[in-house]
Amino acid sequence: GRRTEVRPFTPTQIKLLETFADQAVIAIENVRLFNELKESLEQQTATSEILGVIARSPTDIQPVLDTIAESAAHVCNANDASIRLADGNVLRLAAHHGPIPMFAAAELPIDRDSVAGRALVERQLIHIEDLLSVTETEFPRTQASTEQEGTRTVLAVPLMREDVPIGTIMIRRMEVRPFSDKQIALLKIFADQAVIAIENVRLFKELGERNSELREALE
């Protein structure tokens, strides 16, 4: 506490205060390390869950996309996550997890007038600190739905198979709170996992079709 009289601290008292300061630093560092470990374990758990679903669902992409959306929202500390897949000239909503209703159309034209569309067209991540403040000028197509939903911070990453964009994964927050570099890196990993899963299902189906053809030819 504070002293009202002027009397210097003794060397022992100074040493004791230094010890308390060191202990505080150690405690803070311990909390940081514990949180990092918890985050790391959550990420590993999410990855192993996704791999498990891929293994259990080799011919059906839906359970995999649902799991990836749920994991992305949870691990990246977002209010929701959605995955859209390119289907002809539209981006079709394929999976959504989170309490925010999706007022945006289930199918969005592939152009720069929506966040997901722009991420796909430009083949790069789009990170917007406050979507609500720029939607009128930047993303007119989804202005009405953005205002209805109250979306603030948004991050979209394209799903790239080799050099071809095949869809997007997007996470949102209902407050202005940009995603950290770590969360951005994690969403890219989830995007990669989605691409692997989609490719896996495609190959499995192809293999099944070839086996059927082979069986018919042998009969």
What is each of the regions a protein language model found here?
Residues 13, 26, 33-36, 40, ...:
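Amphipathic coiled-coil signal-transmission "stalk" helices
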Residues 18-25, 188-195:
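Allosteric cytosolic regulatory segments
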Residues 69-73, 81-112, 132:
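GAF sensory/regulatory domain recognition
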Residues 102-126, 142:
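Acidic/proline- and glycine-rich, intrinsically disordered low-complexity segments
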Residues 112, 152-160:
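A short, aliphatic-rich beta-strand micro-motif
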